[in-house]
Each structure stands twice: as structure tokens, then as C-alpha cells.
Regions:
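Residue-identity detector for threonine
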Residues: 16-19, 43, 88-90, 95, ...
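M16 family metallopeptidases and their MPP-like homologs
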Residues: 75-119
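His/Glu-rich zincin catalytic helix
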Residues: 1-79, 116
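Acidic/histidine-enriched alpha-helical segments
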Residues: 122-145
Length: 145
């Protein structure tokens, strides 16, 4: 998974009236069908059991879809009232636009970065435990400034 651009959409935009983080994410062929890799979802849920269930998509679930869901869930668990996220494949196969709502830009960016790190750790089969409190701490600090 390669992220070529991340930007903050600081007002009404093509996707939503809310503020959002938009990223361009390129996935390799094996990263475009993670729903056919049950060990990925199982390992991700071991590390982040608070993650909501995923719907089965007709086109399959990519790492970009997982990134969207994890970034949104991190913000929700940090107490941010967010609900909007989209992942849309572009005209270039394997390239996705990922959009995740935020209420505080610093929190949205930190949640997105934490989601990237978690997915990379799961893909690399890292064995160190995932501590949700440690991940949420930097997400909470900008709110209390």
C-alpha cells in the first residue's frame, strides 16, 4: 500500500459538507482482495477488537477500504463525532481515493497515520501487542488544548 497524497479538505467539498482527510492510496494486486485473506482481518481484529464488522463488498475489500474503516474508528473511539468515510477506486486499477471525516484536523491526521501504522504492522506480521490507549492518547491531546 502506497499513499501518494494526503490533504485536509477544510470545508464543504466533493465528498461531504464536513471537513475530511483525503488520500490517494495505491494497492498492489494482493492488497486489493483482503477479504480473501481471512488471516488479515482476524489479526487486525485481535489488535483492534473495537473495530465494527465489515460488510462484504461485491468488488471485494482492499487495504484502502480497511484504512478508511480503521481511521474512522480511531477517531470515534477518541470521542470525535465522525461518521462519514468513503473509499472509491479511481480510473487507474488499484488506486483509490480514501476520504475520512474529521472534526479536529490534528486528530484526523493522527488517526489516519495510526491506521496506516496498524495496517502495516498487521501486514508485516509484527507480534508486539497493539495498545488502543497508546494510540488514542495523541488523538485526545489536541482536543484538550
Amino acid at each position: 500500500m502506497d499513499i501518494s497524497r494526503i490533504r485536509a479538505l477544510r470545508g464543504p467539498n466533493l465528498w461531504t459538507r464536513q471537513t475530511a482527510i483525503e488520500a490517494i492510496v495505491r494497492c498492489e494486486p494482493d492488497e486489493r482482495a483482503i477479504d480473501s485473506q481471512p488471516e488479515f482481518e482476524a489479526t487486525l481484529r485481535e489488535r483492534f477488537p473495537q473495530l465494527d464488522p465489515w460488510p462484504r463488498l461485491p468488488e471485494g475489500m482492499s487495504l484502502a477500504h480497511a484504512l478508511k474503516r480503521v481511521a474512522l474508528a480511531f477517531q470515534a473511539h477518541a470521542g470525535c463525532p465522525v461518521s462519514f468515510a468513503r473509499c472509491t477506486e479511481t480510473v487507474e486499477p488499484g488506486t483509490y481515493q480514501v476520504v475520512v471525516e474529521y472534526t479536529e484536523e490534528a486528530v484526523g491526521r493522527a488517526a489516519f497515520d495510526a491506521a496506516v501504522r496498524l495496517i502495516a504492522a498487521v501486514r508485516a506480521h509484527e507480534s508486539q501487542p497493539f495498545d488502543l490507549a497508546t494510540v488514542l492518547a495523541p488523538l485526545l491531546s489536541p482536543i484538550h488544548l
